[in-house]
Structure formats: structure tokens, C-alpha cells
Amino acid sequence: MALKHFNPITPGQRQLVIVDRSELYKGKPVKPLTEGLSKKGGRNNTGRITVRFQGGGHKRSYRFIDFKRRKLDVVGTVERLEYDPNRTAFIALIRYTDGELAYILAPQRLAVGDQVVAGNSVDVKPGNAMPLSSMPVGTIIHNVELKPGKGGQIARSAGTYAQLVGRDQGMAILRLNSGEQRLVSGACFASVGAVSNPDHGNINDGKAGRSVWRGKRPHVRGVAMNPVDHPHGGGEGRTSGGRHPVTPWGKPTKGKKTRSNKATDKFIMRSRHQRKK
């Protein structure tokens, strides 16, 4: 899908660049595969703000996406491609030969009328799902499981993908978009292809209101606040904050490493922080 640019007839349209979604289905989603979403506004169950700068936004309904792909050896046909307000990728409505409907993440080069299938030994073509142990080395994949049967967790947002670069003692070696190389069990399922909507990274909202439509409120800098609100606040005139960057709660930020899950370090063969050679 292409990008749409606009003539600058208003200030908000001067910089506006959006994805052309004219080829997507224009109707409503399949009702049995949707559920109502209530607005949280960044609040928890006690009503206190736990995530700042969230609130408002257009009403949404949640689409149930099949991330597990465990309907094995049943062929499904792509009925239509749809927009999903809850994610950056597009989704595809699949009708299986037994009549069941399901939504899956739409990969690039998947078109209406194409057939997809999940199984232990299926063709390597976009939209098909299979265990990593059944894939040829070098395959571009998305929606990759970290634990067999848990459902895809890696490479699910627009334009992303991972690559199967090798195998080792029942484990698959993946190269992720970040540059990280990681071991995953060969029994984990993954889907073939890269995720749809690769132009998502090139859009320009053109005005603050488009972020508000998505439920994102203005992100206020700490140095623009008062001392009561932030460690960087206060000072006469504009200041640089006067200390190394910290969160509103005084903890170091901007580059401070926060990873604490040492149990899975053994699965990371090459860190995403290593210098690119």
C-alpha cells in the first residue's frame, strides 16, 4: 500500500502523510470475533493514574486475533483484509473449509482469495504457519512463539519480521529486527513472511490532534514542570534540569539498563546492544 500526501490547504495537512488504506475492507468487523473495550485513561482499579499521558481517543472494539494457529492441516481462504485500530498491522479474515472464521495478522503479499494453512509440513508461503523445526534456514517469519503453544509474541507489529538463521540441538536461532540473535525451541510455531503495512514507519501525523484521536495526550517534559511535579522542575528561566536525566520518581533514565530477567540470558546469543559490525 502506498503513502498519501496532501496539498497544504490547512496547517494540519501541510506535513500530513498517511497510509492509503483504500484496498482494505470498508465495513464493520465480524461481531462474534470482537469484544467491547472500555477506556482506561491510564488509570488502575483504584482510579489512580499509573501510566501518564493517556486518555480520550476514538471508541474501539477489540478484534480477537488467532496468534496460536493451532487449527492444523485445515485450509483457510482469505475473505478480506481489514484495518485494526488496536495494532499497527492489518489483519486478515480467514474462512476455513469447516466454516469457522478467524482473524490472523496479515503478512505482506497476502491477497484476498489466497489460501493459508497451519501444520507440521506445509508449503513455505506467506500466511502459512509451522514449527520452526520444519522451516528451511533463511526463512523470513513473523508472529513467533517463545514457548510452544503460548501464541506468537515476537515480530507482530507493522513491517517487522525475524529470520531463521540456523539450528542447534533442537533449538532454532533467530535474528530479530533489533539485531539480537536468540535461541527459541524448534517446537515453537511461527508464520511465514513479514508483517503487513511496512509504510507505517513513514507516516507523519501533521498535527497533535491525530495523537489525541489515538488516546495519546501531550507528553510534558520534566524541565517544563514545577519542582513539586518533577525532579527536573523549577529554576529561573529555562534550565537544563541540573542533573542526570531521571524519571518523575527520581530513578535514572535515558540509557539506563532495566533488564532484570537473567533466567533467559542463556537464550540470547548476541545482544541487541552489541556494536553492529
UniProtKB/Swiss-Prot annotation:
InterPro entries: NA-bd_OB-fold, Rib_uL2_dom2, Ribosomal_uL2, Ribosomal_uL2_bac/org-type, Ribosomal_uL2_C, Ribosomal_uL2_CS, Ribosomal_uL2_dom3, Ribosomal_uL2_RNA-bd_dom. One of its GO terms (molecular function) is transferase activity. The keyword Ribonucleoprotein applies. GO terms for biological process: cytoplasmic translation. Part of the 50S ribosomal subunit. Forms a bridge to the 30S subunit in the 70S ribosome. Belongs to the universal ribosomal protein uL2 family. PANTHER family: LARGE RIBOSOMAL SUBUNIT PROTEIN UL2M (PTHR13691:SF5), RIBOSOMAL PROTEIN L2 (PTHR13691). NCBIfam families: rplB_bact. This is Large ribosomal subunit protein uL2. It comes from Brucella canis (strain ATCC 23365 / NCTC 10854 / RM-666). The lineage of its organism: Bacteria, Pseudomonadati, Pseudomonadota, Alphaproteobacteria, Hyphomicrobiales.
